[in-house]
Amino acid sequence: MELLRTVSDTKRTFYALHTRPINTIYRRVVEELMVEMHLLSVNVDFSYNPIYALGVVTTFDRFMEGYQPERDKESIFSAICQAVEQEPQRYRQDAERLQAVAQSLPVNDLVAWLSQANHLQQDADLQAQLQAIANNSNFKYSRLFAIGLFTLLEQSNPDLVKDEKQRTEALKSIAAGLHLSDDKFSKDLELYRSNLDKMTQALAVMADMLTADRKKREQRQQQASTPVAPPNE
């Protein structure tokens, strides 16, 4: 019998693949995403789908905004995926494909499609997966899947997701069509949006602190380089 990989195994693999240090404010983001993906990957009811992939990519890209050095971001993402024995290119490609579909559709058509009220021809593979999800009583729902659905709405019509009434109605329709818990779905997305706001605020505070620190250093350097006039005799 094959032993299931543990969270420790996954973390060990990640840090073997990405050996550069990770900035403190982002380390928690990276580890929480990695642990969430790990726990799903070892769940017997979980199966990969493009909407989940979009949720993973969106979560990483949004919460890693502003990360320095910028060139390390793709290495970190790649290491996360490989640590849970997944292909990072597959996640990126599926995410890009779904975003392109969402951007090409009026939001009402997208909601009807996601809620299985209508069948559209833009992506036969996604259509088949949506039907399979709706018909699978053991479908393993996840927060990352919810974020993927939310991202599709956001890509189709950014104004809709900012309007509480329209957003709530769209999410209820999608949850009903895919047989998801509306309460769980809504709460997960509220938490996601709240955490994004907190991360934005934390980054703004950090940027202000770095600016203030730089100004202090510049002042000290200026004072050190200013010649002191000799005292008058």
Swiss-Prot record:
Question: Which GO biological-process labels does this protein carry?
Answer: photosystem II assembly
Q: Which domain of life is it from?
A: Bacteria
The record's listing under InterPro entries reads: Thf1
Keywords recorded for this protein, A-Z: Coiled coil
Keyword flag Manganese: no
**Which Pfam families does its entry note?**
ThylakoidFormat (PF11264)
Coiled coil ranges (UniProt) are: 183-204
Instruction: Tell me where the transmembrane regions lie.
Output: none
Q: Where is this region: Disordered?
A: 212-233
Q: Name one GO cellular component term.
A: plasma membrane-derived thylakoid photosystem II
Q: Which family does it belong to?
A: Belongs to the THF1 family.
Q: Which HAMAP family match?
A: Thf1
Role summary: May be involved in photosynthetic membrane biogenesis.
Q: What is this protein called?
A: Protein Thf1
GN (gene name): thf1
